[in-house]
Amino acid sequence: EDTESLHTITVEYRSPSSDWSTTDLSTLWHNSATSRWETNFTPPTTAELGEYDIRIQVDDTDEDSSGWSTYSDVLEVLNNGPLVTSYTPSETELYRTTSIRLQAGVSDTEDSASSMSITLQYRSESGDWATDYLSTSYFNSSSGRWESNFTPASTAELGDYDIRLSVTDTDSSTSTWYT
C-alpha cells in the first residue's frame, strides 16, 4: 500500500454553533520523526468560545477513503484573561481631604482598554479593603488609562495605605489583584 506521506489528509473543525471549516488551520504536514500528520489551530481573537469538534479523513493514491472520523469536544477555545499592566499614583503622600489621582494601565487580547472595567480598593494599616475614599473609575481616552481619585476623609487613619486593583473584560474574566 501507500507510504504515510503519500496519503491525502483532510482535517476540519467545528465551533459550538457553526459548520465545518479549515479557516484557522495551518497547512497539514507529515512529521516523519513522529510518523504523524500535523496542523496548527490558531483561532482569531473573535473566535467563538467553547468546545470544538475535529474530523479527519484519509484518502490514498488509489482514491480509497477512510470516510470521516469525528472527535467531539476535543479543543476548547478560551477567553484570554485581562491584565493590569501598570499602576501609578500622582503622588505618594497626601493630606486628609486632599486628592491624588490613581492611574491604571490594562490590556486584553480581545478587548480594548476602554471596553473593560476596573475595581479599585484601598486599606489602611489596620483596616479592611474598602472603596469609600475612591471616586468612580473612568477611562481617560487621552492617557489610554483608567483613573480614579483617592480622597481620604478628615477622620482617615494616618499612615500607609495599600491600593489594589483588578480588571474585568467583556467576557467577564477578571485578572488577579494587582497590589
Feature locations, PLM:
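Proline-centered linker/hinge motifs at extracellular inter-domain junctions
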Residues: P82-L83
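Solvent-exposed serine/threonine-rich low-complexity stretches and specific carbohydrate-binding patches
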Residues: S21-A33, A130-S141
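Short glycine/proline/serine/threonine-rich loop/turn segments at secondary-structure transition edges
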Residues: T45-D53, A113, S154-D162
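Extracellular acidic, Ser/Thr/Pro-rich low-complexity tracts
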Residues: E1-T3, S15, D60-D62, A104-D111, ...
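Aromatic sugar-binding surface patches on proteins
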Residues: N31-F41, N140-F150
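Terminal edge beta-strands and adjacent linker/stalk segments
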Residues: S65-L78, S173-T179
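Short, solvent-exposed loop/linker segments at the N-terminal edge
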Residues: T92-T98
